[in-house]
């Protein structure tokens, strides 16, 4: 015996057929053979409440349709809007009315303009009705006008004319056909009162409109954050990186950034503290300095050390973690002097382990300026990064040569995007010895020097620490230099044509200041325009 299970389309057809039968009056039978009870009738108030709840649920950003994949809830959206709602606040309306100025600034433009239009119409109606009652009591509306009778307001004979007189008084348009006389002191007092109320109402409206237009909320929308954050090695330390940029030419003054790590925390007594905030030290480099110079896009760096909340997360546990990292950027708007705040957040699924951000800045030699390509603002590329947690990585004492990955291909991409070649980056102080002079004064057993000669082995320096040493400038000591603190270094003789058109090469340019201090009469080195291609051999001469 074969059982056939109806598909979803057939089940929907059967359900619609049963619903149609119920609407026609034939009640279907239930399992025990008894007819189903009639549906409960709902009241009008209950139906209105149900419709209001459905409309509010559909318009809420928390609502997710069943046909779509459910997304993880977050406290702060990518656009900076906080996903937090307050309920059951005692005396909320009363507190909002006490702070009416802030309430009016926070409401939307359409509600604010509608409220002000209603306030104007209400003011005109109240004072127009007052003028009409004064004219009615004074007898100005009687059809047979008495002889030698002076009205309080001339030519005010209907409700509409009194309304127009109130509008003229409110906006100081100027009296024409209708004007006030000195017959009634009460009418004059009402005119003065209306002038004061109109002045207060217009001042309040202008102040709110100006404050609403000048607030830096829209200025914060021109600050963009990267869609993804990355974790990679930087100077031998695992770092959490994200990128921030400002699209405007008027920059933020005294900009500083903060990182908040939000997760549930369990105390020693077993109490679960929801949404606990951990402060994460962050800055534009590995130094703990939260101040930014936001002229070009900056990569924010948080060093993952023992004090970091990311210290025990590895590549696998990061994907199943439950936390949220909120980035807060604050600064003073240069044009208005007001404080602007931009914020975003990153979930564990938005943190890429073992990636770097692509470079945006391209030097244009044609006009001497720097070009920023925002098409690559969110782009990353994978690099060699340990998959273990920072705690395990630091305790294992790894060899950093295994994770070295020079981004020379990024500079080639910059050369292709630029109209002219991009200048070489300055050497990093982490790639070279701290005392270059001692590096050259090493013993003969060092792999940098050959066994039988005191010549400098360029291949050993090139492969030292797994890093490529870029071409650098040499400073020749003058013949009159008699300093006993360093050795004389001379070059092998080369072709005269090459010597006249090229510059000498030796160690990094960061050592120039050492040589200048040791040689009192040495001149400033000449700039290198076209470095030679062939390697330069350097001889070590003993002290004189």
From Swiss-Prot:
Regions crossing the membrane: 110-134, 187-208
Extracellular side, ranges: 135-158, 178-186
Cysteine pairs bridged by disulfides in the record: none
Ranges annotated as biased composition (Polar residues): 438-448
Secretion signal span: none
Coiled-coil parts of chain: none
Classification via Pfam families: IRK, IRK_C
Region Disordered: start-end pairs: 411-448, 512-533
Localization of this protein: Membrane; Perikaryon; Cell projection
Keywords from the UniProt entry: Cell projection, Ion channel, Ion transport, Membrane, Potassium, Potassium transport, Transmembrane, Transmembrane helix, Transport, Voltage-gated channel
Disrupted-gene phenotype: Strongly suppresses the egg-laying defect caused by a mutant form of egl-6. Very mild defect in egg-laying behavior when deleted in a wild-type background.
Record GO cellular component, one term: neuronal cell body
Gene3D superfamilies (UniProt xref): 1.10.287.70, G protein-activated inward rectifier potassium channel 1
Cytoplasmic membrane side: 1-109, 209-544
Keyword Transcription regulation tagged: no
Tissues expressing the protein: Expressed in neurons in the head and tail with no expression detected in non-neuronal cells in these regions. Also detected in the egg-laying system of adult hermaphordites with strong expression in the HSN motor neurons and weak expression in vulval muscles.
Membrane topology, as annotated: Multi-pass membrane protein
Protein function: Inward rectifier potassium channels are characterized by a greater tendency to allow potassium to flow into the cell rather than out of it. Required for modulation of the activity of the hermaphrodite-specific neurons (HSNs) by the G-protein coupled neuropeptide receptor egl-6 which in turn controls egg-laying behavior.
Family: Belongs to the inward rectifier-type potassium channel (TC 1.A.2.1) family.
Protein name in UniProt: Inward rectifier potassium channel irk-1
